[in-house]
Amino acid sequence: MSNKLIYSGKAKDILATDDEDVIVAHYKDQATAFNGVKKEQIVGKGVLNNQISSFIFEKLNAAGVATHFIEKISDTDQLNKKVKIIPLEVVLRNYTAGSFSKRFGVEEGIALETPIVEFYYKNDDLDDPFINDEHVKFLKIANDEEIAFLKEETRRINKLLSDWFHQIGLKLIDFKLEFGFDKEGKIILADEFSPDNCRLWDAEGHHMDKDVFRRGLGELTDVYQVVWEKLQAIK
């Protein structure tokens, strides 16, 4: 199998395989926050993120969500379909938290009557700015039909995820998704789903996600291990 490095990101390396339509995602032990301003090597993080994301993507595939995930092939690696990533972070918020609370001057933890979908332009140089539908079209990132699909699919995924996490006593506060075009030009879910790109709170309001690292609240891998163990109880 070819192992040529295609791309090195903050949390993952993307490697080529002998099949031009398939890549390997290698999960690193690196933790970052604030667009890479805060950075630390945390042993075991890559294994946990790969386990959690593989588990979630397998369940999403089984539920009929089209994703890039093929299979987990080692503790830190998984096979994915190669996609052309859409340069958008699609964020869904079920509760107020993080940048949303800061932007609108509201306390964290308020349940939103209707989940809110937001777009952020994937551009590190610009610090991934918050943009609206018209900006998305102006930048020729997606058209009206594609924007509608991204929102609808994100809401569908939210219903599945929220139910699964509710089963294990965790609130899905918010999360970030990325999508891409497969070789047929179909939009499918890509990237990962782990505590790196979502907020999870337990019944006491404790953070069970990367906010533990962002805010210096404890050992990240201890929290991720608890999430991983809880996930085993999902039906």
Curated annotation (Swiss-Prot):
It is an enzyme of class 6 (ligase). Its EC number is 6.3.2.6. InterPro entries: SAICAR_synt/ADE2_N (IPR028923), SAICAR_synt_PurC (IPR033934), SAICAR_synth (IPR001636), SAICAR_synthetase (IPR050089), SAICAR_synthetase_CS (IPR018236). GO terms for molecular function: ATP binding; phosphoribosylaminoimidazolesuccinocarboxamide synthase activity. Keywords: ATP-binding, Ligase, Nucleotide-binding, Purine biosynthesis. Pathway: Purine metabolism; IMP biosynthesis via de novo pathway; 5-amino-1-(5-phospho-D-ribosyl)imidazole-4-carboxamide from 5-amino-1-(5-phospho-D-ribosyl)imidazole-4-carboxylate: step 1/2. It catalyses: 5-amino-1-(5-phospho-D-ribosyl)imidazole-4-carboxylate + L-aspartate + ATP = (2S)-2-[5-amino-1-(5-phospho-beta-D-ribosyl)imidazole-4-carboxamido]succinate + ADP + phosphate + 2 H(+). It comes from the Bacteria. One of its GO terms (biological process) is 'de novo' IMP biosynthetic process. Belongs to the SAICAR synthetase family. PANTHER family: MULTIFUNCTIONAL PROTEIN ADE2, SI:DKEY-6E2.2. This is Phosphoribosylaminoimidazole-succinocarboxamide synthase. It comes from Streptococcus gordonii (strain Challis / ATCC 35105 / BCRC 15272 / CH1 / DL1 / V288). The lineage of its organism: Bacteria, Bacillati, Bacillota, Bacilli, Lactobacillales. The gene is purC.
